[in-house]
Regions:
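Secretory targeting signals
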Residues: 1-2
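N-terminal export signals
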Residues: 5-24
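Extended terminal and domain-junction accessory segments
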Residues: 18-20, 24-34, 139-171, 248-380, ...
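A long-range scaffold signal marking pre-active-site subdomains of enzyme folds
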Residues: 19-20, 24-92
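Extracytoplasmic beta-sandwich strand-turn segments characteristic of Greek-key/jelly-roll folds
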Residues: 60-67, 89-123, 203-205, 238-272, ...
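Asparagine-centered strand-capping/turn motif at beta-strand->loop junctions
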Residues: 77-81, 219-222, 383-387
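Hydrophobic or amphipathic alpha-helical targeting/insertion segments
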Residues: 117-153
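Acidic-aromatic/histidine active-site loop/patch
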Residues: 160-211, 220-223
Length: 438
């Protein structure tokens, strides 16, 4: 077994957002990193008892992986947990065998074992990496981190302000509540909601921003289920310039809704006005972070040249249409579903199999194939969220356009990998199948 000291040559023990040092093979364009998943302890409040977390490199969030478009990313992953794990590279149009889904694209990485992820970075933007084995537990305990891919000519990093969001469910001792992980109540009610908000692993941090110029706020939600909504002090307009990593034609919103796994890049025209980031999804307005200014800058982002989707909206005249009927959860419309070849009542599924959700009347395993799609086909996933719960829908290996009411006509200019579906909503997720895989 490889020990942590030998595997990880250097890391920070502080619970703050830091960049992971890399070994660069310039000749071959390879960026090499090391990630260790292991048990960790963390104190959420002064004088509180220690919480038992699982972290990458003893950091919360995991360290920033920063690379340049065109690089080959190579990450040596060491699993020092007492259970299997893998890493999914969320939002990356990845090689199938590098996608991190245990039992489908790779075997799970067993305790004490290593696995090397190696894949090209073909798109710029903000992505993230997270555990994909029992993600309901491992991600909730802290196994996630940001992945930032820049353009080789981008000289604006000093004005990027990364905001990694999470909400944690703490008990009366200010410790992460572990006993309720995987509870049927959470699974049937749209997921686990916390009661303690962190930004970059801290409660109400003070974050430095450049003064007298533009800055870019880059939001990433690692929450299990909570759908957050933010505004800035004085209701400063937030100009959306990228969604899920992909640039879009800029448009302003007063409040920004961020679902689990979504990312938004927000352009603030005058950063000297920034004072607070406020969470406003409930009647209680919460200060999520405060801002203070650093050195002056008069530089500006060239949004006209930069902010176009990676590729154009496809023609859909001859698209392959795949219907997906999503049912389940509490107060839903699922009475029974087929699981492992047998139709069972929802009560039976919940009590004996801990299964509560179904697509097209079936509870999927990796032995079921939704559809066979030819390379290059245009596909419309016609999804009906026939439940009482909002749900963030994510595609692996593909980005898509959405035909919905959320951004109206702007949807044709917005490319995503995660979309927040409303209860009873019907939407079309449209993509070109240009990345082979399962």
């Amino acid at each position: 077994m490889i020990n942590r000291r030998k595997f990880l040559l250097s890391s920070s023990s502080a619970f703050a957002l830091t960049q992971l040092p890399s070994d660069v093979d310039a000749k071959n364009g390879i960026k090499h990193y090391k990630l260790v998943a292991e048990a960790a302890e963390h104190i959420f409040y002064p004088n509180a008892q220690k919480s038992k977390l699982s972290l990458y490199n003893q950091q919360s969030p995991g360290p920033i992986i920063h690379a340049v478009k065109g690089d080959i990313l190579e990450v040596d992953f060491l699993n020092l947990l007492d259970e299997p794990s893998t890493i999914h590279w969320h939002g990356i149009r990845n090689l199938n065998e590098m996608d991190g889904v245990p039992g489908l694209t790779q075997p799970a990485v067993e305790p004490g074992e290593t696995f090397t992820y190696r894949f090209p970075l073909n798109d710029t933007g903000l992505f993230w990496y997270h555990a994909h084995t029992q993600a309901w537990k491992q991600v909730t305990k802290g196994l996630y981190g940001p992945l930032l891919v820049s353009d080789v000519n981008d000289e604006t990093h000093h004005r990027d302000v990364l905001l990694v969001l999470d909400d944690w469910l703490l008990d009366d001792n200010e410790q992460l509540q572990l006993d309720s992980l995987g509870s049927l109540h959470d699974w049937s009610h749209g997921g686990r909601h916390g009661n303690f908000l962190t930004v970059n692993g801290q409660s109400k941090p003070n974050i430095e921003v450049p003064s007298n110029g533009q800055c870019k706020l880059r939001f990433l939600s690692a929450a299990n289920a909570r759908i957050m909504k933010f505004e800035l002090n004085k209701k400063i307009p937030m100009k959306i310039i990228a969604i899920d990593g992909s640039p879009c034609a800029p448009f302003a919103v007063e409040k920004l809704t961020v679902a689990p796994a979504q990312r938004y890049d927000i352009l603030v025209e005058d950063s000297s006005q920034l004072e607070e980031l406020i969470e406003v999804s409930t009647s209680e307005r919460l200060t999520a972070a405060s801002f203070s200014t650093t050195k002056k800058t008069q530089e500006k982002f060239d949004v006209n040249s930069e902010h176009k989707p990676w590729y154009p909206h496809p023609q859909t005249t001859h698209a392959k249409i795949i219907d997906i009927h999503m049912q389940g959860g509490a107060m839903g419309n699922l009475a029974a579903a087929v699981f492992e070849g047998e139709e069972k009542s929802l009560r039976d599924l919940a009590q004996n199999d801990a299964k509560l959700w179904a697509f097209n009347g079936e509870i999927g395993g990796y032995g079921l194939t939704l559809a066979d799609i030819a390379l290059g086909d245009t596909v419309i996933l016609r999804v009906w969220n026939d439940t009482r719960w909002r749900h963030a829908m994510h595609l692996h290996g593909q980005h898509f356009w959405v035909n919905s009411k959320e951004f109206g006509e702007r949807n044709r200019q917005v490319l995503r990998d995660t979309y927040l579906m409303q209860p009873s909503e019907k939407v079309d997720l449209i993509f070109t199948a240009d990345n082979p895989g399962l």
